[in-house]
Amino acid sequence: MDTVHEGHHGSDSSSSGDTVNVEVTNYEKTQLGQAPLPLAPAPTPAVPVNEKKHKSQKEKKHKGQNEKQDKDSDDEGEDPFAHLPDHEKAVLKRQLDIPTVKVTYFMLFRYATLNDKLLMVLSALSSIIGGALLPLMTIVFGGLTTTFKDFFRQTITQEHFNHELSRFSLYFLYLAIGEFVFVYIATAGFLYTGEHVAGKIRENFLKAILRQNIAFFDQLGAGEITTRITSDTNLVQDGISEKVGLTLTALATFITAFVVSFIKDWKLTLILMSTVFAIVFTMGGMSGFIVKFNKASLASYAEGGTVAEEVISSVRNAKAFNTEAKLTRAYDAHLAVAEKWGFKMKAVTGSMIGFLMCYVYLNYSLAFWMGSRYLVSGRIEVGDVLTIILSIMIGAFALGNVAPNIQAFTTSVAAAAKIFATIDRVSPLDPSSESGETLKSVEGHIELRNIRHIYPSRPEVTVMEDVSLIVPAGKTTALVGESGSGKSTIVGLVERFYDPVGGTVYLDGQDISSLNLRWLRRQISLVSQEPTLFATTIFGNIRHGLIGTAYESESEEKIRELVENAARFANAHDFITGLPEGYATNVGERGFLLSGGQKQRIAIARAMVSDPKILLLDEATSALDTKSEGVVQAALDKAALGRTTIVIAHRLSTIKGADNIVVMSRGRIVEQGTHDALLEKQGAYYNLVEAQRIAAENENKDQEEVAILDEKDQNLKHETTKGEQPEDGLKLARTQTGKSQSSIVLADKKAEVENRYSLWTLIKVVAVFNRQEWLYMTIGIICSVITGGGNPTQAVFFAKAVTALSGDNSTPQGKATIRSQANFWSWMYFMLALVQFSAFLIQGYVFAVCSERLVHRAREQAFKTMLRQDIAFFDKEENTAGALTSFLSTETTHLAGMSGVTLGTILSVIVTLVAAFSVSLAIQWKLSLVCISTVPILLACGFLRFWMLARFQATAKKAYEKSASYACEATSAIRTVASLTREDDVHLHYHDQLVDQERKSLISILRSSSLYAASQSLIFCCTALGFWYGGTLIAKKEIGQFQFFLCFSAVIFGAQSAGTIFSFAPDMGKAKQAAAELKALFDRKPEIDSWSEDGEQLSSVEGHIEFRDVHFRYPTRPEQPVLRGLNLTVKPGQYVALVGASGCGKSTTIQLLERFYDPLAGGVYIDGKEVSSLNVNNYRSWIALVSQEPTLYQGTVKENILLGADRENVPQEAIEQACRDANIYDFIMSLPDAFDTIVGSKGSMLSGGQKQRIAIARALLRDPKILLLDEATSALDSESEKVVQAALDKAAKGRTTIAVAHRLSTIQRADMIYVFDAGKVVESGTHTELIHLRGRYWELVNLQSLGKAQ
């Protein structure tokens, strides 16, 4: 029977007990001593309360993501908790609520240390001084203009003129030196503090995540957490780094410019201030929209990130069912929504920049118009008008430079809002809290009193109703019952993963909610059904069990001794020492490099190493083969002596010796007692035992069993040595093969990323993604040319207007001429403003389309290409689910740095420079050449900074990817982290990685800042040179005022706008790095290519399978042989079982059949054709796989089942039939939303048994010719197993079936059983034949005997 919420068994991120069943077959009802009922859910509390309410909720609930479940329902006026009493509602909501945090920009600096603040103050002051230096230039400029005028009127001598010229030129030089020093301090300071503060935010976010209660994770995907910790913290860093300095510099320039203007003439300045108000008003109004749209875009990307994380972490499943295309579509749906919001945001930003530039030109128009009137009236001199106009021009330009940075600030605030909401959330069950009592000594007496429990993320289902249970100290209590009956829920409540809505749990008579949570968890060791190991060594994994215990601070020798003893105890020592690196072997992410049984034994060793007072075993031996199980079970029985043990078992043979066996059903206790007492009762327990009884051949006595156990221990020891030694010769020869195959790809990939691609190649990569937008691109380019032409055009207008104002204003006629000419050029400026406004507006719109579509397509393509790769790619350490998800969210976003706005800006700048140079050369080539000679130096500085940042980016990315992967691993295994109280340990390790990264990047920061500062200060050198040389030419009477001002303003402002290219260097640096990474990914052609059309297409399959002398090693572990000359044959339609010890190659055989890998030697044949010669997709379409850990994705039950279909448009009847065959139909129909029920991230809303049956339904929907069952029933209780096994037996008719099984009762009826040992077949035959042989199989069967305990 089954539940709605509970399975949580999937990944650790969502694995916890069983929930209440809602589907009960008549057969089960009779078994449990109830009268048969109609299939409609009975109105007991176990059933979803208030059916009608749920029907009405059906439409509204879950608009696509259960994370927002509560919020959505509330928003729509429908509260999912409405049917519950207030106190229960409060308990559940407390476990889910995330307060919304209002984040202001300055809150981003909340983690800045005193040193950071001092450095920021120093950097800010430097930025301000650096910014203030530019307008001071206008005073020098005004002074020089006056000197020119005096020289033309011959009121000063040539010598005096030359002296003044040299003096003013020197002032420029001093300004240049000052600018270099201050800009350097500002840039380096803000880059450093930005990284440091962002690191602190990352660290505090992870710390906060680790102290949250488990219900918080039930509604948040691991992918969303990864997105926050990588992409969102990068956005925050972007908003608090060098852009702060650039903005302060620009604002200081702006303010100083106006101060200078006011000093010269307050009236004219006040008139020109009107444009400033327009600028401020526009920016204020528009940035509100920018934040709003950006938030929506980020939210959609986060949901997409969760989908990607789910898919990548279960990629074998996606491959087996050829669902890559369907899953890509699901991912793409989120990207499409994000694109829409991203487009709106960028279009608004484009419009804002358009308005700002328009105001700048209108300002000139007004300045010349009013300036000419004041000049004519004798109120001011021409030098003052110029200083005011120049200052305001420089000030306004500076304000224009602020606009692009505003986007970074608003984005960083939006990204920080969700991060800080989590950081500030007070966890109702906080393991880091010091509050709560601790007991002096622990007896281990546990009592559950009147427990009523509901999972917070599934408020409509009551999981446990009025359960009272006493677990005496030092005794073993076993919990049995169907899936979803509430067994694992008890474990979750004892560990205090959740608070019950009613009743109390006591430890030694003390309410556990009054005890310190971390102290409580340290008294308990938990081994769960699907063990989670961390990506470190085997030694490190077992050592995690010592955290928080008295042994933690022992010497290394003592710890090693404890670890090895625990491993011996768990029957793991022998296989560990058999590995090439022994205890130093790295287990890979989630331990994927080990078999299920090996992982489980390490998990048991980890639990036992601290000698806990209370031991919780949630199906601790379900992943073990019979051999290991016998030894480990004996060890666990021994371990249970003298300590309180709660055991959950589906395999009843493992709990015969328990002091009390508790039978649960539908969230209640049905009966309890010892094994014998319950058998005599002939009630529910008796029925469960009957369901599991093995065929009658093995009526062996217990003495024989014990003898075999002892002998088995010996066997194992010398088997390991015996099995490994003679392999040496083979090992050497084969390692070569393994290494060459796996390492060539790696070597290639690295070489490509580092140096293979030229910038041109990378630009082509980006161009391909935007190919369809060529029309938009063309329009954007035309607009960029127009916007670029604005600068040189206004240089001509400027020189003309200045010359007009310098005319003789002593006569009425002269005054009239000045007025009419000034009016004409003012009108020209007005026209320029309108043209520029239109061009910026259109450019903003078209580039927004291009860059959003670029990011969307790049993400989709990258995800597709990842799914195209073979399994060996995902086995590599650097390609963990966390690292790849983080790659998808950050790298593709960076790609935008090579498109849209950035390219538009660069093009504008190039046009500006070319046009400015052309105009000035045409007017006065001598002066122009001198000014132009400085521009290459400016560009060289920019290029160098670009190159430095690209290198900086590459190393930073690697470091953060590693730490992000680490954080993702910890958060997705949160139950394990919580039960081991590893929170501080994880946080400390993460902290060390971040500190290391900061130290490495410091030198890089100092170098790139010096280059940037040089590029900024050279503007003053250009100016000095221009003035000095221009003055010299004027002195020689070679040029007049018009030529001087034209060349000067064209080249100076041209050079200044060339400087803006460099503010885009970080984006370009990131984009170049991202494009190289993506190109490397796109170029990687997998050995087994699911996109390939090559290979023979099969039109029909008989199902004859043959392995001929197959040798195999995993590419990531070439030194470890797995299959060593495997031979086996499966005839069409046969049901074949593979049995044997953990790690002997059974699951590997299934993986080779699915063609996840190709053998190193020998071949796998289907109907006489070698599998590697067939088209891989066509071949897989004939096969269905049901694996040990069922994989479900976020979405509805129906969507998950449909993933099995190899065709579109599957009729509902076919789906329902598949569900009936998998014995899950009644359960689905009893759910509030039936087939439309959301299953949660990784299927977290369902119990293990329910997930497995949905997985079976998915496999049956394919109607496969070959059915592969990799421990398909290991997650099921006896009742479900019996029915599902019957369904599988029925499904196996007419098709070839290969089953890997640890529970031998499930495969007795197999046509052929192959017994594996050390990578080859040692026995084969039917169950009866093998029993008569009295060999290895007979031994395994004995170990699983279920007779009465004697």
Swiss-Prot record:
Residues covered by region (Disordered): 1-84, 712-734
Keywords assigned: ATP-binding, Cell membrane, Glycoprotein, Membrane, Nucleotide-binding, Transmembrane, Transmembrane helix, Transport
All residue ranges annotated as the ABC transporter domain in the record: 446-691, 1105-1343
Protein name: ABC-type transporter MDR1
A cellular-component GO term for this protein: plasma membrane
Location of this chain's protein in the cell: Cell membrane
Compositional bias of kind Polar residues: 22-33
Glycosites: N1127
Main location: membrane
